[in-house]
């Protein structure tokens, strides 16, 4: 394993750790404040915009989709993680740095959420953004990593001026 590939997997591990620690802190703080129901841990209001930290649980995929298919969804997620590991392991040297960063973020986010499912039976979400009466579905750092990685990957694939060898 090269130094670069080791740093990629170490970065992924650190991001997963950051995600899990943030969820643990939110859950512990929530239990201290209100042991029987989710507690508002933090709020920031700026005009009609608000940012809240309130623990919630998601048994499905993004936005709670497919919650009734827990086992197939878990199998699919594990399959995607294994594919990402294999792809990064096999193609690592030939990947563009932006592709590597994007896939590392996606891998870390996927691992963070699968870890939640294995340990809690559901994903722990706690970040909430609201504007007027509109609320974006709650999310966590793992979701943010997946979203950022996807945006980086799509941006790189779409806007790359280099030869069209993406992977």
From Swiss-Prot:
Catalytic residues (UniProt): 125, 143
Subcellular location: Cell inner membrane
Catalytic reaction equation(s): Release of signal peptides from bacterial membrane prolipoproteins. Hydrolyzes -Xaa-Yaa-Zaa-|-(S,diacylglyceryl)Cys-, in which Xaa is hydrophobic (preferably Leu), and Yaa (Ala or Ser) and Zaa (Gly or Ala) have small, neutral side chains
Annotated metabolic or biological route of this protein: Protein modification; lipoprotein biosynthesis (signal peptide cleavage)
BP GO annotations: proteolysis
Membrane-spanning ranges: 8-28, 46-66, 70-90, 101-121, 139-159
Keywords: Aspartyl protease, Cell inner membrane, Cell membrane, Hydrolase, Membrane, Protease, Transmembrane, Transmembrane helix
A GO molecular function held by the record: aspartic-type endopeptidase activity
Topology of the protein relative to the lipid bilayer: Multi-pass membrane protein
GO cellular component: plasma membrane
Class of enzymatic activity (EC top level): hydrolase
The enzyme's E.C. designation: 3.4.23.36
Functional note: This protein specifically catalyzes the removal of signal peptides from prolipoproteins.
Family the UniProt entry places it in: Belongs to the peptidase A8 family.
Protein name per its UniProtKB record: Lipoprotein signal peptidase
Organism: Chlamydia muridarum (strain MoPn / Nigg)
Lineage: Bacteria, Pseudomonadati, Chlamydiota, Chlamydiia, Chlamydiales
